[in-house]
UniProtKB/Swiss-Prot annotation:
Membership in a protein family: Belongs to the OXA1/ALB3/YidC (TC 2.A.9.2) family.
GN (gene name): OXA1L
Membrane-spanning intervals of the chain: 119-139, 155-175, 227-247, 269-289, 312-332
Location(s), subcellular: Mitochondrion inner membrane
Chain positions covered by the region annotation Disordered: 362-414
Role: Probably required for the insertion of integral membrane proteins into the mitochondrial inner membrane. May participate in the activity and assembly of cytochrome oxidase.
InterPro entries recorded: YidC/ALB3/OXA1/COX18, YidC/Oxa/ALB_C
Protein name (Swiss-Prot/TrEMBL): Mitochondrial inner membrane protein OXA1-like
Transit sequence range: 1-22
Keywords: Membrane, Mitochondrion, Mitochondrion inner membrane, Transit peptide, Transmembrane, Transmembrane helix
Length: 431
């Protein structure tokens, strides 16, 4: 009998070992720290925590513990492993921050933060400033920013360098304008003759049409138009306006302009309280007028008016320039200096020969030089060589002013007599 009981006990133990692992997940404990003890002790703790359940209380009794730890583990199937007591390590977890301090060092976090704060505004500030601008103004702002980023220069030097680049691109167009102006001045005597003939035949529509046709042929033959002197205004006008609005917009909306200057004009967003930049701009403009505009204007009927008007503008512009931001002077002053260098360079004979410009003729009083067209000149200056070609050489007997007037009057009378003779011949032929 004892042998049979012993065999049954072994079989029950084997069956319990086979079935019990399948129920092990019901009492899993994922904590890092596990308490040592047998499975019976763990089951008792579970049953004690769920003592409110009647069935659990039943299994908590000593008489039913053997049934709970039986081979099929029926006691475990009727209770839940739900504890209201928080784990021991829960008070150590306040958030996710403890992981970041271990994974990412503080030095890297500070470096990324400072880099994002310093680099991102520098990249986006010009784009934000140019967002609400017109296309030419926005394009010019991006060009200044590209020069600033590529060269690493301060804003004042970037504006000056961009001015030189833009003015350098317009040099071929200005040279073409200068050559066309010379050709137009050579045609001026012929055009004046045609105008006189047309004025005498103002009542004859056919004669007026013929005169206009001959003028068009002359313009086409020499490749010029009456609007040739306006090329400088058409080109330089939009450039000046675009620079003005672009730089002023950047001075208002780009924060780095506050430290983008040098010397006494470090802050480019404010006016110059020392009045040095406004005075320099006005003086360079006046020098530009005296050295470039006065040359070759002797034959132009509006030469005196233009020169006086430019002088007045040079003096009246000082109060206006005082209220302008310093950043604008980086363009304005550079543009004036560029025009001066451009005019002085064209005075050299070797440069004129290289550019295929007409030679300068020496005068009795001084040696004239080629005119340098200014950005906003409504009348293009004439070169003295063209004036010398227009006017025939005067003899020594006609050096005084009275013989000059007599010769001019006699030439006009002869011209009128010839036109009257032609009209009489035309009438006889028609009859």
């Amino acid at each position: 009998m004892a042998t049979c009981l012993r065999g049954i006990t072994k079989r029950v133990n084997l069956l319990q070992r086979r079935v019990y692992p399948s129920c092990g997940h019901l009492i899993r404990d994922d904590r890092d720290e596990t308490k040592s003890g047998s499975s019976d002790t763990m089951i008792r703790e579970v049953l004690a925590r769920n003592g409110t359940n009647k069935l659990s209380s039943m299994f908590a009794d000593r008489h039913y513990q053997s049934f709970a730890t039986g081979p099929l583990g029926l006691g475990l199937s009727s209770c839940r492993h739900m504890s209201s007591t928080p784990p021991e390590w829960s008070d150590k977890v306040d958030g996710i921050d403890f992981v970041a301090t271990e994974v990412v060092p503080d030095e890297i976090i500070e470096a990324v933060t400072t880099t994002s704060q310093a680099v991102v505004p520098a990249i986006n500030e010009v784009a934000i400033a140019a967002a609400d601008s017109a296309f030419p103004v926005a394009a010019l702002q991006h060009l200044i920013d590209a020069v600033h980023s590529f060269t690493g220069l301060n804003w004042w030097a970037s504006i000056a360098l961009t001015t030189v680049l833009i003015r350098g691109v317009t040099i071929p167009i200005l040279l073409n304008q200068l050559k066309a102006t010379y050709k137009l001045n050579v045609l001026r005597p012929q055009l004046e003759e045609l105008r006189q003939e047309m004025s005498t035949k103002a009542q004859d529509p056919e004669a007026m049409a013929e005169g206009q046709r001959r003028m068009q042929l002359l313009f086409k033959e020499h490749g010029v138009t009456p609007f040739t002197p306006l090329k400088g205004l058409i080109i330089q006008g939009p450039i000046f306006i675009s620079f003005f609005f672009a730089i002023r917009n950047m001075a208002e909306k780009v924060p780095s302009f506050k430290t983008g200057g040098t010397l006494w004009f470090t802050d480019l967003t404010t006016t110059d309280t020392t009045y040095i930049l406004p005075l320099l701009t006005a003086v360079t403009f006046l020098i530009m007028v005296e050295s470039n505009m006065q040359e070759g204007l002797e034959g132009n009927p509006v030469a005196g008016t233009m020169k006086k008007f430019s002088r007045i503008i040079a003096f009246l512009s000082i109060p206006v320039l005082i209220g302008i931001e310093k950043a604008l002077f980086c363009y304005w002053l550079t543009s004036n200096l560029f025009t001066l260098v451009y005019g002085l360079t064209l005075r050299r004979p070797d440069v004129r020969k290289l550019l295929n410009l007409p030679d300068v003729v020496n005068s009795s009083t001084r040696q004239p030089s080629p005119s340098s067209p200014l950005p906003f000149s409504f009348a293009e200056p004439k070169d003295q060589s063209v004036v010398a070609q227009e006017k025939p050489p005067m003899s020594s007997e006609s050096s005084s002013s009275v013989p000059d007037r007599r010769i001019s009057r006699s030439s006009v009378l002869n011209q009128r007599i010839r036109t009257l003779e032609r009209q009489l011949k035309d009438r006889k032929i028609k009859k």
